[in-house]
Every structure is written in C-alpha cells, then in structure tokens.
C-alpha cells in the first residue's frame, strides 16, 4: 500500500509544481497588481503543497530525521516569536475589515485573515510538539501539529 501511496503522492507533487509554474508564467503577463498578487499567492501555495507532499513521502519511507536539541531550542524561540506576530496580524486585519467598506477589499482581507488563523493554529501545534520534547513518531507529529487546524480532519 505504501508504494502505491508514494506513487500517488509523487504524481501530486508533479501536478502542484506544474500548477505553480503555469500560474507564475501567467501572472508575469498580467499588469493588474491584485490579479498578479492573487495568482502569485496560489502559485506559492502550490509550491508549498509540493514541499509538504515531499515531506509525506519522506515520512512514509521512514527517512525523516529526529530533531536535535539545538533545533528544539531554536524552534522554541522562533515559534514563540511568530505566534505573537500572527496574533498581531490577526488583530490588525480584523480592525481593517471593520473600517473598510469596499466588499472586494474585505474579501481579500478575509482571505488573509483565514491564512493567519491557519498559521497561528499550526504554530501552536508546533509549539506543543517542541515543548514536549518527547520521542514523537512522525505521524504523532502530524496529529500534534494539525489537530487544531480548521477543516483539516
């Protein structure tokens, strides 16, 4: 089963990379800044998805490496800092939504806010995993990190 799963995920990596390249090429030909930004954002997400799929393949093959103590220390500091940044961004975007009347602008702001909320939930899950410093299997990492992310499970 894992061989078939790895093959399927590998195909998904190729699709995400093709999608990213296609969107990047198209956005380079567009003059409207908002359209360009939205297309670039989707292309970036496709590259991110391909990267995450590669990590899944590594995990399925049993090739993932455990974190070192130095990595735990660095991650603890970095994650704590970024949790605060995400909280500030969520508050700032929520304030903008309240004062902006144009629904098109609000749509973009809500899109950004949704991303910030997902980032915040992921960072909290990562922080929990880093703080535990227990021997955690790769699939336990997935559960710890993703359990509070809306719409994931």
Identify what each model region corresponds to.
Residues 1-153:
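Non-heme di-metal
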């Amino acid at each position: 089963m894992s061989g078939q799963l790895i093959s399927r995920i590998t195909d998904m990596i190729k699709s995400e990379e093709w999608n990213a390249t296609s969107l990047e090429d198209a956005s380079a030909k567009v003059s409207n800044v908002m359209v360009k930004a939205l297309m670039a954002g989707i292309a970036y997400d496709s590259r991110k998805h391909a990267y995450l799929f590669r990590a899944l393949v590594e995990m399925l093959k049993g090739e993932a490496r455990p974190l070192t103590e130095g990595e735990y220390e660095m991650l603890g500091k970095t994650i704590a800092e970024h949790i605060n940044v995400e909280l500030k961004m969520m508050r700032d975007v929520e304030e903008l939504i309240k004062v902006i009347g144009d629904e098109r602008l609000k749509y973009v702001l809500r899109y950004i806010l949704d991303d910030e909320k997902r980032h915040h939930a992921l960072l909290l899950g990562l922080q929990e995993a880093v703080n535990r410093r227990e021997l955690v299997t790769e699939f336990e990492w997935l559960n710890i990190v993703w359990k509070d992310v809306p719409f994931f499970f």
